[in-house]
Amino acid sequence: MEQPKQKTVTGFSLFKSANTLVATPKSLDDLIKYIDFAKQRNFKIAIQGGGNSYSDVFFNDQLVIDTSHLNSIKSFDSENGQITVEPGVRIGDLLNVIMPQNWILVGLSGSVNDAIGGMLSTNVHGKDSWKNGNFSQNIISFKIMLADGTTKIVKNDTGSELFNSIVGGLGFLGLITEITLKLKHIPSYMVQHQIQRIPNLEKLVDFFYSLEENGLEYAHALLNPFVSGKNMGYKKALENTLSERLAKLPVLHSSHAYQSLFAYHQYKHIVTGHFAQS
């Protein structure tokens, strides 16, 4: 086990940083030793995956455990669409393995450098989350190491309080050591896409209503910072459109999805698509 090193850690935004000890385990034995290291010094532990969070969720001033070297793909069942990985595996590396076999994951974030453990711990959303849900929909089970060094297997059982507490729990309850994911079959890794201009929020909502009936699965809105007049303002739109119409969409049963659409209030162009036959 290497001694933790003093480093400055930053997130994707580079807006905040923290000067802290950083430990980089290369095995589960190393991980246990770093946990003991922290316990002996009464240190708090933060866990870093890909380091791509916009916020400071993996910052502290005592000890950060960097999981980037826990990056093995343990098994891949290409017939049944199931894969087991360590938490430091980057999504780009995983996609390079599964997509040539016509498999994909749902609820993927926009960066190929995100780590699977971090995606679980933040329950990231993607361009298809309006239809397929967030990253948690991929999870079959995972292993988590607790503060006493013991490991527990947590399954994605309906109504599981422990599962729901850990997924999206930002690493507060332990450190993910292994994740088993179910994969979604795709006809090919080619995507048919279209780009449309959306003048304002009301038209964007209309477009979201039409996504499924048009056979579209992915939607990504891009901000135009130069809009002005009625197309820029959002107060009236939020009071009228969001409260009356967005709440009726089935996808908006969760507050997270509601907030995602809320963020689109000044978006002007939207890219949509679906996987195509090769």
Where are these regions (language model features)?
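Noncatalytic alpha-helical scaffold of FAD-dependent oxidoreductases
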Residues: 1-278
